[in-house]
């Protein structure tokens, strides 16, 4: 039996809960959603997929993404919910020896972007928000740290985890990176009507930073679109869309929109990856749909 999940905070908490609820000894297999969608991941019998698209080779599946819904029978639970961790917690709640309710509630808020302006601008004052920002998704693989966090969350309370020397160092780094990221966002983001478009393709090193900062910097925008090269050889482009968490007037289901371009996700946040040769066709279409701001769920 093996856990297969994605390397974000929700995925890490999914792993914590599955390790606690089930008899699992194998290490986590960390993968990105797009790799599952493209059939690039080796999935085998006994695997438990969490927070990722369904693969019919797995034995159990837990997810909450709008565009990942399937209409055939499977073992596990699919539910539109704030987090996949919350889906797992509800399913196995009678098996836990520790009280994970606070962790799951925090994960729900973080993964669904249900955050206050103070939490976005001053994450260092909010423990779980800060801890989640030490997990950098989409950067270089960081498996030892992801595995370490799983162990810490299974054993200790939040303050003990925040005081861990490595976590402490990463917290300091997050604050430094957020300051730099603010500068990058201002330089590389433009407004097209109510759409803020952040284009990092001109940068050799993609900056890491608080994904919610852009909403505080461009309050008139209802949705942000971020563009970057996925690979160093610039053959693939990654696009992510997020509804503003402070100006909630975006009518476009982001997951459904990007499903038309090989991606998917939630109503309020989604991503896709495609060949750079398709950028001149795909990007204007995506931007046009966001500018029209029409409900695309019907």
Language-model regions, residue ranges each:
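Hydrophobic, aromatic-enriched interface-forming segments
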Residues: 112-195
